[in-house]
């Protein structure tokens, strides 16, 4: 019996190893500008943060779509993954804060009219929120949110909290994104698409599932009477 040679790749495609071939690292790592093409050295930092964020958002969208059609247990697992993806996207913004305002200004000249509003990942995720809420309401079967939170029946209560956590993570990203922009270019200027940066600040208060936030007010008021 001939021993298998594990030093040689067995998958098709370019790359010296199966790791490179499966992950298509040649293509992936060619998506960033070379050192010779960069107008400023921090273009690599900026591009890496945003490209990796789009990958995490792609996964988040995949998991949310799964949650819409899954039974409760699987939906909770998928929503938990989506939440972790959003945490990673939010944490990645810290790297942008390591750029000085001067360096960011240099990179900004290369962005054209590109802005965070154009993120296909966030746009897709936003479009999936109504479907999530519709599915959750179907699971409630006429049970009010107030009764749900008074008695905490599982798995409905866990699903409600998972939706709230997803909504909360989107808000946390908006806050961090706004503060990152304010720190790098200021809050009283015009963005790359001609929109005042202060508009980002107003988006902080938007909610995907406002009913889940409002029921907390109802519970608190009811407890005080």
Language-model features, listed with the residues they occupy:
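Surface-exposed peri-terminal alpha-helical interaction modules
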Residues: 1-225
């Amino acid at each position: 019996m001939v021993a298998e040679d594990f030093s040689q790749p067995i998958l098709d495609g370019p790359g010296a190893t199966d790791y490179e071939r499966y992950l298509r690292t040649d293509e992936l790592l060619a998506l960033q500008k070379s050192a010779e093409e960069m107008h400023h050295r921090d273009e690599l930092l900026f591009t890496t943060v945003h490209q990796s964020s789009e990958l995490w958002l792609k996964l988040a969208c995949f998991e949310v779509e799964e949650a819409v059609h899954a039974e409760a247990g699987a939906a909770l697992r998928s929503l938990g993954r989506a939440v972790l993806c959003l945490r990673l996207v939010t944490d990645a913004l810290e790297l942008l804060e390591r750029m000085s305002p001067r360096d960011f200004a240099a990179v900004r000249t290369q962005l054209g009219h590109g802005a965070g509003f154009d993120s296909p990942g966030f746009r897709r995720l936003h479009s999936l929120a109504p479907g999530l809420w519709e599915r959750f309401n179907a699971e409630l079967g006429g049970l009010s949110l107030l009764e749900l939170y008074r008695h905490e029946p599982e798995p409905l209560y866990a699903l409600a909290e998972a939706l709230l956590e997803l909504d909360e993570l989107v808000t946390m990203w908006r806050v961090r994104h706004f503060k990152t922009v304010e720190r790098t270019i200021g809050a009283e200027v015009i963005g790359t698409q001609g929109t005042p940066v202060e508009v980002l600040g107003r988006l902080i208060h938007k909610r995907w599932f406002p009913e889940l936030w409002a029921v907390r007010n109802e519970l608190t008021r009811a407890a005080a009477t």
